[in-house]
């Protein structure tokens, strides 16, 4: 029971603080007061350039004026290279910049959150939680005296369109004063607000966070992994410009991310409180001090349990891991010399530990894939479920199956002490390798290994009576389980059910560390454990599947798009390959074929379902030739592209020619884009093009005609009757995980 209790305590304490009500003191953050802003902010989606976003901008400016906070709207035309190919994202952005001058004002602390949302949801958490927290923090700051340094509250536009608002703020005169940035995001609707990324002097920032935040939660593993996930936030822009910063987000409730369920009702009060608490306390502390150093020794940091944050210099990580490996090797050698270990038994134990962990990962992945395919849960692009707990419990139970079967197989081949060393040796080697490659993640292996090493030592010192052995094994396992659960739970939340095999592979290795305690508890009944774990896993997975069906309060996503190809005089209904059900069938038929549609969806690198559709009389972009000049072999085309009302994105695809200059509006494309475009062509996505038309200038060398394919993308599906609309149990697929509820019209012109 103590071991189960340790897991329960770790899970129960991994939560945000209690939300404060309206009666909280005026100088502190109150989630109840912040929530009042969400009721009007997250009424409906507010994608970049939309009428709803314009309304929100006006309301924000009105609130800031009522608080007597100096604010302005920064309007800037922004072009940003996406990735390394010739793809450019562009928009005219409207950032809201609120500036609180400091008493000295030698530098500025920047607090940022984006006030736009995805088209597929009202964005209460992403990123209404940041906007509401910023407004409540501003109110609290105005109750006290001015701070020492300037504070800039930046409400960015067009974050969901590709961080364009943050890129635009780099053009603002105030940006030169910014030395510190705090950015607030959400990848779910609940859970603690975690520090998941830093830029600049990491060690100095972690120490400030540890000293200042009332409930500091986060870990350096996230900071090591995040840069490789291909995800970016506004802090990415500021960090690349040399600004020191901290990035915060809550990540539980992933299934709501970028969907209609990212609503005020789903947003947890505790998450909002934690967000705002971090924002207000860190802003006060950082704006009261001096500028951060340019460099600072890195630190490893993590929460062993709850909001207890431990940090230490990163330089300690490798010596600690090497020391633990040496201790384990010495223990192994000592056991062999004393006759307690046999080389063959040890080799089998190591092989069993590694193969058991791999088998557990494969079993869990297969079980989830079968469950997804059988229930239709593969429709959730986030790789999760509305009720993940039964699935998480079922998959965790399955981890015990290969673990128990291997112990049953090794009953007459491998001794318990050999199993113990067979688990700790590969863990110790992994600890050293991980520390070399990824020092911020070293705590994940080092500290559990230290606790695991103490168990056999305590056994040899504690006597051999059954009650003493049980006490030592149980008490040794409690801190190990506390630490591991506190570490693996946020990792599993970040990865989702689709990648549960990764986190549960580690869980299987942890079972190996706990072998002495588990062997004492099981007393050789490993067959019973395997059968019981299989049954428990099946029951939980089945119960989760039965309860997972679409309902009005838990809708499932189904994608649908309409593509009109004017060149080929054809039209298609398009949908994700995992789309199924009666609603989609009325457009796609019962068994639609699948293929790639790069002309319509160039960002997708997969097949989509399709079915022929009627050619609708929809307006498309119109390109007017303003000027066409030639000097030698260089041709300069000046164009004006008019897009129909309701166009969310105007896309240009230029062929692979030797472009010397491409100018969108008044802004030239970077040379890197032109260089890439000479081989691959150039793609420009301009969000919310101006109503008066978008100027486009092309300077190209050579005689070949410029065949430009233009596309208009609107955020709707044309001519749906009331009976054809989605039922309440369905919703649009999440933005950013493919496509949904868009109309694409393409045409090619020879210029």
Positions of the model-derived regions?
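Hydrophobic alpha-helical transmembrane signal-anchor segments
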Residues: 1-21, 528-543
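Peri-membrane helix termini and adjoining interfacial loops of integral membrane proteins
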Residues: 10-14, 293-299, 370-375
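Extracytosolic and intramembrane catalytic regions of membrane-associated proteins
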Residues: 58-87, 91-99, 131-132, 211, ...
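Ser/Thr/Pro/Gly-rich low-complexity linker/stalk segments immediately outside membranes or between
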Residues: 13-30, 550-560
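Soluble extramembrane regions of membrane proteins in the secretory/endomembrane system
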Residues: 17-312, 667, 676-702
């Amino acid at each position: 029971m103590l071991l189960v209790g340790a897991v329960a305590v770790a899970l129960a304490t991994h939560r945000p603080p209690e939300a404060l009500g309206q009666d909280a003191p005026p100088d502190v953050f109150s989630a109840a007061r912040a929530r009042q802003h969400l009721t009007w902010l997250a009424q409906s989606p507010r994608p970049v350039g939309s009428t709803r976003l314009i309304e929100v901008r006006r309301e924000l400016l009105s609130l800031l004026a009522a608080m007597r906070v100096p604010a302005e709207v920064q309007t800037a035309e922004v072009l940003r290279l996406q990735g390394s190919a010739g793809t450019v994202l562009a928009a005219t952005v409207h950032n809201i910049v609120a500036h609180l001058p400091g008493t000295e004002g030698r530098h500025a602390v920047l607090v940022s959150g984006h006030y736009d949302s995805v088209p597929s949801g009202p964005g209460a958490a992403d990123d209404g939680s940041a906007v509401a927290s910023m407004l409540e923090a501003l109110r609290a700051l105005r109750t006290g005296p001015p701070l020492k340094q300037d504070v800039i509250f930046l409400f960015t536009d067009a974050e969901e369109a590709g961080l364009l608002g943050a890129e635009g703020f780099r053009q603002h005169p105030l940006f030169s004063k910014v030395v510190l940035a705090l950015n607030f995001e959400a990848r779910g609707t609940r859970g603690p607000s975690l520090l998941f990324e830093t830029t600049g002097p990491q060690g100095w920032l972690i120490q400030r966070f540890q000293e200042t935040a009332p409930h500091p939660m986060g870990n350096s593993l996230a900071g090591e992994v995040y840069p490789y996930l291909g995800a970016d936030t506004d802090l990415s822009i500021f960090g690349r410009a040399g600004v020191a910063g901290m990035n915060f987000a809550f990540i539980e409730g992933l299934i709501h991310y970028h969907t209609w369920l990212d609503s005020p009702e789903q947003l947890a009060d505790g998450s909002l409180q934690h967000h705002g608490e971090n924002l207000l306390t860190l802003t006060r502390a950082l704006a009261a001090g001096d500028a951060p150093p340019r460099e600072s020794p890195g630190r490893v940091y993590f929460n062993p349990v709850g909001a207890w944050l431990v940090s230490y210099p990163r330089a300690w990580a490798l010596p600690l891991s090497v020391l633990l490996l040496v201790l384990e090797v010495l223990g192994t050698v000592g056991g062999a010399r004393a006759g307690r270990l046999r080389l063959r038994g040890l080799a089998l134990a190591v092989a069993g530990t590694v193969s058991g962990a791999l088998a557990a990962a494969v079993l869990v992945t297969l079980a989830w894939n079968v469950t997804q395919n059988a229930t239709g849960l593969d429709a959730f692009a986030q790789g999760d479920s509305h009720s993940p707990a039964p699935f998480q419990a079922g998959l965790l139970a399955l981890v015990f199956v290969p673990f128990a079967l291997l112990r049953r197989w090794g009953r007459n081949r491998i001794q318990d002490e050999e199993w113990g060393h067979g688990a700790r040796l590969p863990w110790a080697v992994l600890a050293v390798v991980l520390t070399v490659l990824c020092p911020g993640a070293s705590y994940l292996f080092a500290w559990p290994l230290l606790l695991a090493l103490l168990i056999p030592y305590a056994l040899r010192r504690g006597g051999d009576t059954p009650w003493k052995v049980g006490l030592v094994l149980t008490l040794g396992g409690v801190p190990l389980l506390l630490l591991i659960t506190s570490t693996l739970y946020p990792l599993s939340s970040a990865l989702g059910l689709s990648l549960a095999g990764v986190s549960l592979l580690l869980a299987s290795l942890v079972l190996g560390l706990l072998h002495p305690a588990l062997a004492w508890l099981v007393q050789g009944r490993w067959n019973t454990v395997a059968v019981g774990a299989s049954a428990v896993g099946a029951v939980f997975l089945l119960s989760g599947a039965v309860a997972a069906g679409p309902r009005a309060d838990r809708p499932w996503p189904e994608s649908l798009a309409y593509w009109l190809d004017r060149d080929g005089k054809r039209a298609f209904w398009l949908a994700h390959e995992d789309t199924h059900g009666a609603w989609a069938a009325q457009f796609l038929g019962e068994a639609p074929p699948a293929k790639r549609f790069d002309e319509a969806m160039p960002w997708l690198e997969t097949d989509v379902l399709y079915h022929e559709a009627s050619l609708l009389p929809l307006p498309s972009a119109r390109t007017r030739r303003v000027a066409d000049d030639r000097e030698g072999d260089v041709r300069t085309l000046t164009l004006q592209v008019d897009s129909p009302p309701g166009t969310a994105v105007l896309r240009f695809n230029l062929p692979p020619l030797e472009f010397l200059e491409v100018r969108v509006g008044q802004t030239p494309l970077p040379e890197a884009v032109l260089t890439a475009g000479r081989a691959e062509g150039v793609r420009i996505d301009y969000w919310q093009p101006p109503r008066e038309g978008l100027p486009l200038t092309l300077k190209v060398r050579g005689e070949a005609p410029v065949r430009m394919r233009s596309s208009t993308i609107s955020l709707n599906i044309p001519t749906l009757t009331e009976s054809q609309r989605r039922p309440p149990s369905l919703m649009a697929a999440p933005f950013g995980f493919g496509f949904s509820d868009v109309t694409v019209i393409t045409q090619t012109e020879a210029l």
